[in-house]
């Protein structure tokens, strides 16, 4: 009998915690990644995550938080992770609707739209996003609160 992994959407702020060691919630983000690698958790994201990942690495390079070699390694590592990327076309309309309704960026809303469409929780490492919308969206979760056994 095969075990079906639980599914969640992650945003780029969660994924970038796998690279940086100086951010809040890195232990839980690391556990989330371990659960994914070990097959207990299926990670989903809009394909936008790849661009935000690259932009986050670029910003870290400019701020001298990471070295060039670390950025290259991290850029390559993203494609090795078992993240189910969803194309823009799957969520474009719902993304615009959620951005308008919640007055959030189209980028942030893409992750929310995918989670709503899939009917799964969305984990974020962005405290401002979480604080602004967690009361309205009961499926939006702060990565620092991640525990596999708490997922529906």
Where are these regions (language model features)?
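Acidic, PIN/NYN-like endoribonuclease modules and their adjacent C-terminal/linker elements
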Residues: 1-7, 112-152
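Short, well-structured N-terminal submotif of metal-dependent ribonuclease cores
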Residues: 1-48, 60-69, 73
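Active-site neighborhoods of divalent-metal-dependent phosphate/nucleic-acid chemistry enzymes
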Residues: 3, 83-123
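A general alpha-helix detector
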Residues: 14-15, 52-57, 74-77, 94, ...
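Alpha-helix capping/helix-boundary segments
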Residues: 14-15, 49, 91, 111, ...
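Structured helix-beta-strand junction loops
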Residues: 38-40, 81, 118, 136
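Recognition helices and adjacent regulatory flanks at domain boundaries
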Residues: 45-46, 69, 78, 84-86, ...
């Amino acid at each position: 009998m095969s075990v079906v992994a639980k599914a969640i959407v992650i945003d780029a702020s969660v994924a970038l915690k796998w690279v940086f060691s100086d951010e809040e919630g890195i232990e839980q983000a690391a556990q989330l990644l371990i659960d994914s690698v070990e097959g207990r958790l299926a990670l989903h994201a809009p394909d936008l995550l790849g661009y935000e990942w690259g932009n986050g690495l670029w910003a870290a390079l400019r701020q001298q938080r990471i070295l060039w070699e670390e950025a290259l390694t991290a850029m390559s590592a993203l494609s090795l992770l078992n993240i189910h990327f969803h194309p823009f076309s799957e969520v474009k309309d719902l993304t615009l609707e959620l951005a308008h309704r919640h007055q959030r960026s189209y980028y942030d809303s893409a992750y929310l739209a995918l989670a709503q469409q899939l009917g799964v929780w969305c984990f974020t490492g962005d405290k401002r996003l979480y604080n602004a919308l967690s009361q309205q969206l009961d499926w939006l979760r702060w990565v620092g609160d991640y525990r596999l056994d708490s997922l529906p």
